[in-house]
């Protein structure tokens, strides 16, 4: 019977994917994590968010609330996401390298005003060497001149609501980052244009300050983990 085939009691138990956050100093790694934490705390029940030094566990139900219509919790059997911060200073490159290697997936935070910087390139090298899947959080879109804040809104919609001039400016900055990824031998595009995340890097425009793109970022991370790393998340119970 179809019902027995769909019985979820035989589904494997899955662990929480570990998400490393990397990027150049002052590009907004910690601010982005703080925004995710803040959104999670405000949307979750007391005690739902587990925080340790340098790490934050955000359960699926909280991610679903933050992401809104972008995430249907019934589509996922992962328990949530565990974010780990990695030190931004050059002297911590060894520790950051270890953090990258320990992660299942990573967020590479890049300031849309600065593009790739030395520690960005170092982070990309770490991700290449450890073969860690990653997405790019193109941060600080709220600092583009003329940007009209759309707090906590999906970034594609937030960008489309801006004036033509601002849209053009944002798009130009994003494609400069995509070009830099191409120079590092990564095929990349705006996340909503990527059909094959196994072979292409998704770029998610975000604002750690006003929250645009945070729903998208969480959605992409959950989707990548569920679709491409589900077997790696399976645990014996």
Model-derived features: positions:
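GTPase G-domain guanine-specificity segment
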Residues: 141-196
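Conserved nucleotide-binding/hydrolysis micro-motifs of P-loop NTPases
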Residues: 39, 63, 88-90, 112-116, ...
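Residue-level signature of catalytic and energy-coupling elements of molecular machines
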Residues: 25-26, 32, 49, 85, ...
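Short glycine-/polar-rich loops that comprise or flank the Walker A/P-loop
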Residues: 16, 53, 79, 102-105, ...
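Conserved catalytic-core segments of large NTP-driven translation/proteostasis enzymes
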Residues: 15-26, 30, 172, 186-237
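Active-site phosphate-binding and catalytic loops of NTP-dependent enzymes
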Residues: 2-9, 40-47, 60-71, 92-94, ...
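Conserved G1/Walker A P-loop phosphate-binding module
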Residues: 2-86
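Inter-motif core of Ras-like GTPase G domains
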Residues: 93-114, 128-135
């Amino acid at each position: 019977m179809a019902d027995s085939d769909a019985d979820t009691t035989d589904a494997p138990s899955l662990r929480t994917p570990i998400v490393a956050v990397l990027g150049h100093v002052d590009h907004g790694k910690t601010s982005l994590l703080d925004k995710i934490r803040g959104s999670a705390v405000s949307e979750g029940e007391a005690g739902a968010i587990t925080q340790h030094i340098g790490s934050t566990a955000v359960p699926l139900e909280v991610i679903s609330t933050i992401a809104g219509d972008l995430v249907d919790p019934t589509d996922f059997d992962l328990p949530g996401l565990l974010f780990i911060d990695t030190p931004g200073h050059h002297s911590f490159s060894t520790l950051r390298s270890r953090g990258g290697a320990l992660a299942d997936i990573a967020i590479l935070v890049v300031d849309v005003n600065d593009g790739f910087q030395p520690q960005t390139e170092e982070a990309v090298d770490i991700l290449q060497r450890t073969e860690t899947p990653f997405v790019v959080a193109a941060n600080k879109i709220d600092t583009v001149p003329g940007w009209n804040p759309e707090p906590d809104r999906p970034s594609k919609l937030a960008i489309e609501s801006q004036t033509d001039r601002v849209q053009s400016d944002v798009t130009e900055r994003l494609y400069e980052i995509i070009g830099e990824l191409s120079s590092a031998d990564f095929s990349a595009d705006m996340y909503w244009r990527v059909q094959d995340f196994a072979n292409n890097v998704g770029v998610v425009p975000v604002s750690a300050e006003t929250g645009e793109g945070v729903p998208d970022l969480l959605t992409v991370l959950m989707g990548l983990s569920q679709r491409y790393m589900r077997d790696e998340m399976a645990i014996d119970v």
